[in-house]
Amino acid sequence: MFPVDKFQDTRTPFYYYDTQLLRETLQTIKEESGKHANYHVHYAVKANANQKILRIISQYGLGADCVSGGEIKAALEAGFPADSIVYAGVGKSDWEIELGLQNDIACFNVESIAELEVINKLAQKHGKKARVAFRINPNIGAHTHANITTGLAENKFGIAMQDMDKVIDEAQTIDNIEVIGLHFHIGSQILDMGDFKALCNRINDLQNQLAKRNVFVQNINVGGGLGVSYDLSLIHISEPTRPY
């Protein structure tokens, strides 16, 4: 219940977070994901990097999905173990990559051979072996706004499917790189779960393609993008708040 009385003297604007609801949601995620072996949920730190919120999330065993050095720092400060932090995103700068290497984070999600070469060079500099997952563009459309779909061949993200074998082969010849997985992300604000089913079917095809070449990866990251329905009847909001 929203504690309206407590906020009558609070200056606006301000953010109110229902941490009890957050904890209940996290507990549900923990219980449901625990029903499946080797299934891990990561929180996208870009959604909200408030330290109090991050600390609560870390207490429930979720990993952290980061897209900047600042987010890696925030996740570490909030108590996320380094081996639960994944660094995704385009345009990673040297200092951000080095931060991930120095803290031995779980994985770098790599968008291109050029990025892989930079990570390898920095890993060599620090005497590290960087664990990486390649972001593959699966050419899967998502039922969402055209400006926030990211999984079609025409989109600028990831490595084309036809280049996957070549990229993995090249990576396996690089001393300071360990390929541990594949990464996918088809868009944001996705409400049709059929989109994720189509993605998983495509991933199975790609894994079979790799298996024929005796190539196996440890991790599959299906990305995020679960949407929020804004089709909410206002009567559920207007009636309880009418007295105020």
Q: Predicted segment positions?
A:
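A charged N-terminal "starter" segment
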Residues: M1-A130, D169, I174-E178, D205, ...
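Glycine-rich beta-strand-to-loop/alpha-helix junction loops that act as flexible
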Residues: I186-G187, I220-G227
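Single conserved hydrophobic/aromatic residue that forms the stacking wall/gate
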Residues: I235-Y244
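Flexible, glycine/proline-enriched loop segments at strand-loop-helix junctions
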Residues: P13, N103-V110, T150-M161, I190-F196
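Short acidic, glycine/serine/threonine-rich loops at helix termini
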Residues: L54, E77, I97-Q102, I119-L122, ...
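Conserved anion-binding
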Residues: E115-N176
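Buried hydrophobic side chains on well-structured beta-strands
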Residues: F134, L182, I220-V222
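Gly/Ser/Thr-enriched, mixed-charge loops and adjacent short helices
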Residues: E170-D192
